[in-house]
Amino acid sequence: MSEIWEDAIKSNAWPFVEAKKILDSLNGQIPEKGYVLFETGYGPSGLPHIGTFGENARMVMVQKAFEQLSDIPTKLICFSDDMDGLRTVPSNIPNPEMVAQYMDMPLTSIPDTFGECESYGHYMNAKLRSFLDKFGFEYAFYSSTNCYKAGMFDEMLIMVLEKYDEIMELMLPTFREERKATYSPFMPICPKTGKVLQVPIEKWDAKAGTVTYKDKAGNYIEVPVTGGHCKLQWKPDFGMRWAALKVDYEMYGKDHLANARLYSEICRILGGKPPVQLCYELFLDENGEKISKSKGNSISIDDWLKYAPVESMALFMYQNPTRAKRLFFDVIPKNVDEYITFNQKYHLEEDRAKRFANPVYHIHHGNVPKIETFGITYSLLLNLTSVCNPSDKSVLWGFISKYEPNATPNTNPYLDHLAEFAIRYYNDFIKAHKSYLSPSEKHKVILQDILDMLSDIADQTEAEAIQKAIYDIGMKAGYENLRDYFKDLYQILLGQNEGPRLGTFIKLYGVQEMKKLVEGQL
């Protein structure tokens, strides 16, 4: 075994941990189908949200980690449940009243409310595929509608009929009495209306491959379970799909956790082997509620990319997948700055094992670009924007160029993008909420001390020396907690409760400019 393999197999980075589980489940053997299958799922009832991107990004991290541990071929499929009947109408789509007329219809049988594709489901699928393509994911797209209608699941659907009693014995204890009386794993597609029916099944015939139900008029209707004439309820469908496609690895949100045992048992009943599974925690909105495609209560991918590079979004997805995280606009600056820190550490680190533990290794699948920001962070640029209120990024570059003469927009495109992002973020989220603290007499003494200190130092003074001088002024002012001291300075000078290390900020903003800012508050 190579040293690289040894470092990878010992790594505690979660993608490698998951990859080792897959390798162990295979006993090192190539599956009969010739590859290891990774599956992600998508419910196209509403527009894809950032959680959909997150699941695919995480899945690829595990896939690439597995490829580092093994030379067994891999395949990633994105499976769209587009044959599901419409249960609720999303609030963030055009013409919701029109869509409401098609309740219980398969998503691929509803007209496209956006007027671009052959159906509502096709439109949602296209949106998913376009942004997966945009970010370079290599995947095969599977449509539930196509799989059912093309007969890909026919063999398994006949087996569900053959194992009908066993599956019902598994499922019924999970329901209330009222639901037990009507439940069946099969949902016929009504020959007249095309709706997905949740009706009691009066008769099932494995030999004929049919189920029989009563329509509203009391007539017995017999339909084949194959060829797209029936769909399985979502829990049996999950397990059936694992067995039919021979899925080796699947991850899903915590909302699936209670049913994971059922998925696995149904897969076994149908002769399959359940995949290795990872349950990730859900993203929460600003109110602590689960984000939802139908509600549209989350940041979209386009929203995030308006204010930050894609790598910061990938870092958010990488970090602690089994921990619930609040996903709103205020998490963006922190993730940008953490990405910069991890990137710099990666390129300073010579120990391969430590590189494997660095999130950027998994974000970039081992091919990590080197970025240079000269110590300038996104947060620092936001604060610089706050004091100079620039109309465009050229104003920020005026300060950046004085701080680091070797930096230019052409030679440092990452920093150039950050400057543009910072102005957008400031205008949309900070500017309207600035609230300045009027300095008290005590504050004015402090400000005068800072002004005197700035007048005495040379322009070449290092940031740490300036920071220490400001720190000493706070100590002399008699604050019990210096956090309160810095908070007061941020409120007086920047109009916000938090701010940068002032030594670094003053070096970027300039000593003379900072003197003018302080004088303005005196």
From Swiss-Prot:
Subcellular location: Cytoplasm
Catalysed reactions, semicolon-separated: tRNA(Lys) + L-lysine + ATP = L-lysyl-tRNA(Lys) + AMP + diphosphate
InterPro entries in UniProt: aa-tRNA-synth_I_codon-bd_sub2 (IPR020751), aa-tRNA-synth_I_CS (IPR001412), aa_tRNA-synth_I_cd-bd_sf (IPR008925), Lys-tRNA-ligase (IPR002904), Rossmann-like_a/b/a_fold (IPR014729)
Motif 'KMSKS' region, chain ranges: 290-294
UniProt cross-references to SUPFAM superfamilies, sorted A to Z: An anticodon-binding domain of class I aminoacyl-tRNA synthetases, Nucleotidylyl transferase
Stretches of the chain forming a coiled coil according to its record: none
Gene name of this polypeptide: lysS
Name of the protein this chain belongs to: Lysine--tRNA ligase
Motif ('HIGH' region): 44-52
NCBIfam families per record: lysS_arch, PRK00750.1-2
GO biological process: lysyl-tRNA aminoacylation
Family that this chain belongs to: Belongs to the class-I aminoacyl-tRNA synthetase family.
EC number(s) recorded for this UniProt protein: 6.1.1.6
UniProt: ATP binding residues: K293
Recorded GO CC terms: cytoplasm
Any one GO molecular-function label of the UniProt entry: tRNA binding
Main location: cytoplasm
Keywords, sorted A to Z: Aminoacyl-tRNA synthetase, ATP-binding, Cytoplasm, Ligase, Nucleotide-binding, Protein biosynthesis
Tagged with keyword Protein biosynthesis: yes
